[in-house]
Amino acid sequence: MKVDLFDFELPERLIAQVPLEQRDASRLMVLDKHTGELTDSSFKHIISFFNEGDCLVLNNTRVLPARLFGTKEDTGAKVELLLLKQETGDKWETLAKPAKRVKKGTVVTFGDGRLKAICTEELEHGGRKMEFQYDGIFYEVLESLGEMPLPPYIKEQLDDKERYQTVYSKEIGSAAAPTAGLHFTEEILQQLKDKGVQIEFITLHVGLGTFRPVSADEVEEHNMHAEFYQMSEETAAALNKVRENGGRIISVGTTSTRTLETIAGEHDGQFKASSGWTSIFIYPGYEFKAIDGMITNFHLPKSSLIMLVSALAGRENILRAYNHAVEEEYRFFSFGDAMLII
């Protein structure tokens, strides 16, 4: 299957550069995956599309302020580090810029010197293994010194770091936000509960690979990045019960979707307490085992994410919906508007 089949024209002005003042002020396009029918709505009205007994599954990961700007201890030369993955304890895999300034043994100092990192290994493509030294609690030091690693298509600075976190974020470890969840407020979640909709959480730590374009010509040749996920025993039991009672399982975002499909795929369509790494790649032809619908944002042309939603709703339906979104000037990507596929 050609990657070009998932291309569409997107004016740059429709790429949202900043979040809206109110999280739930975003627009909502509803796509009937069976008929292809489109409805223009607003996120504040999303409750009306849910039924009592449905279950909403959210990803409670929290984004690390993983961009650190420091100086080499010996020369004072500027260095940027991007935290990619925690190895063990205070050892992290990072991306260094400019990489040539960071050799094995290089010490980088951040802020007022209360955070230091020493390079223990040089990797390819600018990767560096670093061991951190600090006083206090690492994540608190990081919160005060680090910046959010915003996607490459966002050029504006973020005034409030919390706007790149969901209101229910809890488990620290992502390099990017699960952006479909950014629209939710505490009020909307409460209104859904009041209607009899069950709210459940999984964790998937989003990697920077989520922004990596599909460089292959053929969809099947693309290699997905691996991301860590986990589901508790309580959540697994709750989801199995929803399924038994005939309720719908609606995932929030591609990250929740990939987690649920990974787990159901490994347990004959059932949910079980699990943790591990998933590199599941969902594209047209995939048979869904876990979800009945999903809430998502509008994705990049030719990305693995537009392929995932095309698997759920059909490629032609998705491209028609996206063309409608362009005509109606919906906002695209991380800080953009939302789509509900049911």
From Swiss-Prot:
SUPFAM superfamilies: QueA-like. One of its GO terms (molecular function) is S-adenosylmethionine:tRNA ribosyltransferase-isomerase activity. Its main location: cytoplasm. GO terms for biological process: queuosine biosynthetic process; tRNA wobble guanine modification. One of its GO terms (cellular component) is cytoplasm. Its EC number is 2.4.99.17. It catalyses: 7-aminomethyl-7-carbaguanosine(34) in tRNA + S-adenosyl-L-methionine = epoxyqueuosine(34) in tRNA + adenine + L-methionine + 2 H(+). Keywords: Cytoplasm, Queuosine biosynthesis, S-adenosyl-L-methionine, Transferase. It is found in: Cytoplasm. InterPro entries: QueA, QueA_dom1, QueA_dom2, QueA_sf. Pathway: tRNA modification; tRNA-queuosine biosynthesis. It holds the Pfam family Queuosine_synth. NCBIfam families: PRK00147.1, queA. Belongs to the QueA family. Monomer. Transfers and isomerizes the ribose moiety from AdoMet to the 7-aminomethyl group of 7-deazaguanine (preQ1-tRNA) to give epoxyqueuosine (oQ-tRNA). This is S-adenosylmethionine:tRNA ribosyltransferase-isomerase. It comes from Bacillus subtilis (strain 168). The gene is queA.
